[in-house]
């Protein structure tokens, strides 16, 4: 890993990285996050009784849509032709809450970590939005990249994927 910030030039100004000379490779990133909530809120969501409708289905779609809009949201991110975005939402009664895992993939010249992080973040935000009427104490946390593959820096994965214990 380089000790240099790639989006800052020698004068300290922010710039978009020129990826034109990079080789196209298969690239993938997986990010995760979680929404901690009251057990009764989790039960309400799992039973499909939230006032705003299907929380899990809506949050999943929101995450996928957000990944495709990452370059509109994060300055200096390249617009990417994603080949796959997938979002999984799993209940965890021990949390209690919902765990989110988002995958982004492409064949291109730059990584997809920001797209995976955006998908995970917006999925969690949507869960919060759809359930906040019954639980204002929900907590969103531990949003992070847990694995990436492809590109010059190669493959990487966290050694302990558990979060929000």
Swiss-Prot record:
Q: Which reaction does it catalyse?
A: (8S)-3',8-cyclo-7,8-dihydroguanosine 5'-triphosphate = cyclic pyranopterin phosphate + diphosphate
Pfam families in the cross-refs: MoaC (PF01967)
Pathway note: Cofactor biosynthesis; molybdopterin biosynthesis
Which GO molecular function, any one, fits this protein according to its record? cyclic pyranopterin monophosphate synthase activity
Gene Ontology biological process terms from the UniProt entry = Mo-molybdopterin cofactor biosynthetic process
Q: Which keywords appear in this protein's UniProt record, sorted alphabetically?
A: Lyase, Molybdenum cofactor biosynthesis
Its EC number(s): 4.6.1.17
Keyword match RNA-binding:
no
Q: Which domain of life is it from?
A: Bacteria
* Catalytic residues (UniProt): 129
- Assembly and interactions? Homohexamer; trimer of dimers.
**Functional note:** Catalyzes the conversion of (8S)-3',8-cyclo-7,8-dihydroguanosine 5'-triphosphate to cyclic pyranopterin monophosphate (cPMP).
Q: Which family does it belong to?
A: Belongs to the MoaC family.
Q: What is this protein called?
A: Cyclic pyranopterin monophosphate synthase
Native species: Brucella abortus (strain 2308)
Gene coding for it: moaC
């Amino acid at each position: 890993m380089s000790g240099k910030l790639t989006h800052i030039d020698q004068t300290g100004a922010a710039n978009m990285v020129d990826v034109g000379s990079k080789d196209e490779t298969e690239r993938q990133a997986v990010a995760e996050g979680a929404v901690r909530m009251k057990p009764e809120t989790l039960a309400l969501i799992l039973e499909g009784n939230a006032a705003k409708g299907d929380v899990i289905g809506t949050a999943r779609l929101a995450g996928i849509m957000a990944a495709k809009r990452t370059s509109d949201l994060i300055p200096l991110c390249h617009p990417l032709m994603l080949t796959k975005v997938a979002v999984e939402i799993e209940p965890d009664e021990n949390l209690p809450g919902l765990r989110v895992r988002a995958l982004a993939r492409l064949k291109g010249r730059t990584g997809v970590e920001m797209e995976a992080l955006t998908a995970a973040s917006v999925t969690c935000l949507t869960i919060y939005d759809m359930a906040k009427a019954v639980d204002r104490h929900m907590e969103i946390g531990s949003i992070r990249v847990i694995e990436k593959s492809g590109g010059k820096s190669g493959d990487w994965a966290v050694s302990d994927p558990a979060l929000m214990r």
